[in-house]
Amino acid sequence: MARDYYEILGVARDADKEEIKQAYRRLARKYHPDVNKEPGAEERFKEINRAYEVLSEPETRARYDRFGPEGVSGAGVGFQDMSDMGGFADIFESIFSGFAGGGMGGPTQQRRRGGPARGDDLRLDLKLDFREAVFGGEKEIRISHLETCETCSGSGAKPGTRPRTCSTCSGSGQVRRVTRTPFGSFTQVSTCPTCNGTGMVIEDKCDACDGKGTNQVTKKLKITIPAGVDNGTRLRIQQEGDAGQRGGPPGDLYVYLFVNEDEEFQRDGINVISEIKVSYLQAILGCRLEVNTVDGPVELIIPAGTQPNTVMKLENRGVPRLGNPVSRGDHLLTVLIDIPTKVIPEERELLEKLAKIKGDRTGKGGLEGFLGNLFK
């Protein structure tokens, strides 16, 4: 039986994202195969990675909370997409970079610091009308992100010139300081203050981007909203985040969807819920009524003798299942019976006759006794 992901990370089920991230960092540091050579450490590390992969994303976490491991089988973004973590190297860099011989401060890491860097992911919150969420469709959005400067092709240098290798760090992006103590020598590694860790110095900056290599650009995008989305659904638009640095790929744009409330309809999973009001005579005798659905007006049969709060079902008139729009939920209508507070004399006379036939007593205040018994 699979272990509980919250138990694996050692956090409560109501832990917030930061608590989950901190727990993951602590355990990843302890069980990473490059650090922990004990038997079983690698499997434990994979287990920790999978738990974080599910619990760090609101969408997969919600599915896991509701359905357990079966609800997220095959789910997850993959560790390579966890941009907010910066990768395994960044986690361990913060732990080991201050010490020589830590295994994380060698030439490979120096090249990585000055090499291509992926752009940041961006988030956009988008509101949808109720029917837009039900049926999906195309939506135009406006975003502002960093794009590679066309003038300097992202180098940050004026056309015709090139950045030079930083003389302070020799292009590594890092400077080292050796401290000698009675316990031995320690090497502290920090970001080069001259080039800010890039390993390159721009002497003649590009006028178009002021040496940054990127420009802030506002643009319009058309995105496809799948049928059946709900509050909190996340769409990933690849390579529409901020531009990368030094030739690195751009990040992604994550669009979080939020659905406006509807005056008539509510939603419960893939079912649509609404109410319909009928007169007490329609409830007693039965009738045919036209009711509104997300697909438009539909005829509904109210059977004779329908009781208050009876739920009528219109099959396949609900919300399409996300990822499988052929499958739809139902439309559930709660019947509310409108009992009048006042009746005309002719109507009262007829009702009193009916009450006598049924043997019901009527009070001074009207026909509560009769109508109350009628719907028992």
Swiss-Prot record:
Residues 102-121 are annotated as: Disordered. Its cofactor is Zn(2+). PROSITE patterns: DNAJ_2 (PS50076), ZF_CR (PS51188). CXXCXGXG motif repeats lie at residues 149-156, 166-173, 192-199, 206-213. SUPFAM superfamilies: Chaperone J-domain, DnaJ/Hsp40 cysteine-rich domain, HSP40/DnaJ peptide-binding domain. InterPro entries: DnaJ, DnaJ_C, DnaJ_domain, HSP40/DnaJ_pept-bd, HSP_DnaJ_Cys-rich_dom, HSP_DnaJ_Cys-rich_dom_sf, J_dom_sf. Participates actively in the response to hyperosmotic and heat shock by preventing the aggregation of stress-denatured proteins and by disaggregating proteins, also in an autonomous, DnaK-independent fashion. Unfolded proteins bind initially to DnaJ; upon interaction with the DnaJ-bound protein, DnaK hydrolyzes its bound ATP, resulting in the formation of a stable complex. GrpE releases ADP from DnaK; ATP binding to DnaK triggers the release of the substrate protein, thus completing the reaction cycle. This is Chaperone protein DnaJ.
